[in-house]
Amino acid sequence: MIVLGIDPALGKLGWAVVAKESTKLHYLASGTIKTHSKDEIHNRLAFINSILEKVILEYQPNIAAIEETFVNTNNVTSLKLGYARGAIMSLIGRYNLDMQEFKPNTVKKTVTGYGHAGKEQILYMIKHLISGTDLITNSDEADAVALAYTCLVAKKY
C-alpha cells in the first residue's frame, strides 16, 4: 500500500509518499510546492497540480490522505484554501485514487498521542515512527508524512 499524504495550501503545500509492506512503513519521498502570491490563482493551482501529477506518476500511490480544512476567520484565506483543495481533489479523482480526509486533531493524536500537539512534536514523532524521515525539517512536509501515517494506521491497511 502506498499513500500520498497532502497538507493542502495555496502558498506552501506539503506532500509525502509513505509505503507499507506487511507491518513495516517506508518513507519514499516528500517535498513542498511553493507558489507566489503575485501569480494569478489559476496559474498557482495549475503549478500545484503539475507537481503533484509528477509525484503520482512516479510513485503510483493507491490512496491520497488529505487534511480536512477548518473555516478560518479570514474568508478570503478559507476560499483560497478551498480552491487548492478542489484542484487537488480533482487530480486525485482523475487518477482514480482512493481518498481519505483527516481532521488535524486526529492526525496529531495518532502521531503524538495528543490532539493539540505542536508542529515540533509532530516533526519529532515522525522521525521516530518512520525510518528515512531524519532529514525532514519542514513542518509542511512533516504534516504530509503524518497524514500518510495516520491513513495507514487508522485505516489498518
Swiss-Prot record:
The gene is ruvC. This is Crossover junction endodeoxyribonuclease RuvC. One of its GO terms (molecular function) is crossover junction DNA endonuclease activity. GO terms for biological process: DNA recombination; DNA repair. Its cofactor is Mg(2+). InterPro entries: RNaseH-like_sf, RNaseH_sf, X-over_junc_endoDNase_Mg_BS, X-over_junc_endoDNase_RuvC. Mg(2+) 1 binds at residues 7, 140. The active site is at 7, 67, 140. It is found in: Cytoplasm.
